[in-house]
Amino acid sequence: MNSDILYLENADYSDFLVDLSFLKIERPVGVTGLLRVKNDAEFIELCISSCIDALDELIVTYQKSDDNAPEVIEKMRKKYPHKIKVYFYEPSILSHNLSKEELDFVKTMPENSVHLLSNYYNYSLSKVSYKYVVKIDTDQVYFSEKLKGICDLYRSSYTQKITFKERLVSNIALYLDHCYNVLPLMGSLFFSNVIMGYYESYIKKMIVNKKVMLSVSGVNLFFDKNGWEIPLGNNANGIRSPFNGVGDTLFFEISKDTYYTPWECYDKRRNRYFYLEKFYKKEQTVLQGGFLWFHLDAIRKNKYLDNKSLYNGNTIKVADFLKKKNIVNVNRILFMKSFRFYYNVSSTNLE
């Protein structure tokens, strides 16, 4: 059993209990980033620097750390005092790498327990000052211009006419997106070149007009003697796939129907359990926004030396990955399962 939870069982954590009535508060137009931190000092400054200009506000909540993450957070808060707000989340959380006994224990806790990861996420959400929100992760470096462009769409107050062709092509794109298991050999070049220009225009206008939710993803990076490369694994073999966070990051408007609930999952490979968070959003339209960041997990200091040998021969140069003639050489099944997030990667500066 996790001793941290038992040891702090009788502590006064009333300040960390979350009343979901905060979801009904009217907020001014703007975009808030939510950054939750535990360790990760090596990436915090780079992450914040890449996203802060695009955001109206960055809420940083952090837990007890084993490195100097709190000091780095304070450094960045002082650098951007008009945008960054920092909160320390004191309760310990039981969520990752759980035994069956620990999982059974944590599932007995009430859904709003301060020791659940979902409550930690809701606590962070409760500190938001603006109407629109996006999750920010410490080990991600954002495509700053694209992020600002998306935030500007949510901040926009005017409407734009959606053309018949844009609407038609968007329906075709969504249909093809649902067919990737049926048509695994469908050419991504057609999808990217012919359809995606109209689809991207449609997405932008839908955000401006309807403030729909937008789902975004990232690109995993690795670094070796040849420079920056993209891994070609499948995660199950210990090597990252080319894509990161496929669909797990949303831009959304805070409402009574947007909050976090507990979510249980099991890692068969390691025989460990996880009691994480799941974003509840009722039934709302979600459009795909393509790539928005580089994911740096594979080059963490505590992983890099082991990964150098593991990743050897299982990467592709960033420039080659973006060349149309080489895209077809990427694992087709892996690629097609994620190709709906690929369409506008070439518009970002990945090299």
Where are the regions that the model predicts?
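N-proximal low-complexity "stem/linker" segments adjacent to membrane-targeting elements
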Residues: 1-50
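Catalytic-site signature of metal-activated, phosphate-bearing donor transferases
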Residues: 1-18, 104-122, 141-351
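Active-site-proximal specificity loops/subdomain of glycosyltransferases
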Residues: 10-28, 68-132
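A short acidic, amphipathic alpha-helical/loop segment
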Residues: 46-50, 72, 149-150
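Short, acidic, metal-binding catalytic loop of nucleotide-sugar glycosyltransferases
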Residues: 49-61, 65, 75-76
